[in-house]
Every structure is written in structure tokens, then in C-alpha cells.
Amino acid sequence: QYWALGHVHEQQLWAYPDCTIAFPGNLQGRHVRETGARGALLVHADDDRITQVQPLELDVLRWAVLEVSVAEADTFEQAVRLVGQSLQQLLAALPDGHPAAVRGRLQGATAAHAALLARQSQLRQEVIGQAVALDADRLWIEKVQLASSPLERQALDDADWQDTLQELDQLMQVAAQD
């Protein structure tokens, strides 16, 4: 026996001794939540028995979410270079000729967070520029999301606290005189 359900978008296969159940997935990812290879299942049968189920990749464009750690970046420019390196790796992993629609997500605690946050429009343009430089025909940037965070502030020692309190006291004295 063989059961196939076609409207489930993720390909899944269960093979039991007396029954095969297949969700062949969809032929083409239609949005960023449908990443990776898409296609169909070619089912070979001999009389009343399934002998082989072969996945076929049929999509003409891949959706990808590119998670880029910018934790090592100290500057805006270093973060952009890290994205470029990740785009290059993605491009190398794609089947020959396949284009990709890419959502980039920069994440991690980084010294560059404030610069990235302040220059988000430029960040998007820089990422698009990286994609165009690598392969304008195969990489399309759908969106660039900033999910980074600032580095944790280091705890102040007693001397730093004392200096900070003295500065605050001086500011209060000046404010009282005005």
C-alpha cells in the first residue's frame, strides 16, 4: 500500500513493512519560510510493493535564511565583510545555476551593534552590493534583519564607581548654581 498527501509543503517519508506514507512537499518554495530544496518523489513499484522512493529536486529558485554571526566584528565594515563571506559560502553550496532569494539575519553580541543599528539602510545597500559583486544573476536579497546586541558592559570596580559618583555630584552642584 502507498499513501501520498500532496498539500503538505515539507517533504516527509515513512516506510513501513506493509505501507509507505509520503508527503512529497511542494515543487517550488513560495516564500522565505519554505527554504531549501523543493521537488517531488518518484515512486517505483513492483506489483503491489514499493521498491524505491526517489526524491527529485525540481525547484528553480531556493529561498534561504542566512544567519550571520557578527560577534567578532568590531566595526560596521567588518560586519559587512562577514555577511559577504557567508553569501559566498551560500552561493558555493547552491546547485549549479540555481538562484537564491536570501533573507540575511545578523546576530550576536558585537562591538559594532550601535553602528549597525544607526546605519541600517546603508547596511541593506552594502549587503545588496556584496550579493551583486558575487553573482548578480543568482543572489537576490529579500531582506536584511538586524538581530545583534551590544556587548555586555563590564562591571565597574569600586574606583570607577567612586569616579562616577564624584562626576555626578559635581554636575548636581553646577545645576544647583544655575
Name each region found by the language model.
Residues Q1-A73:
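Functional cores that coordinate and move charged inorganic groups
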Residues L56-D178:
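Accessory, non-catalytic peripheral segments of nucleic-acid enzymes
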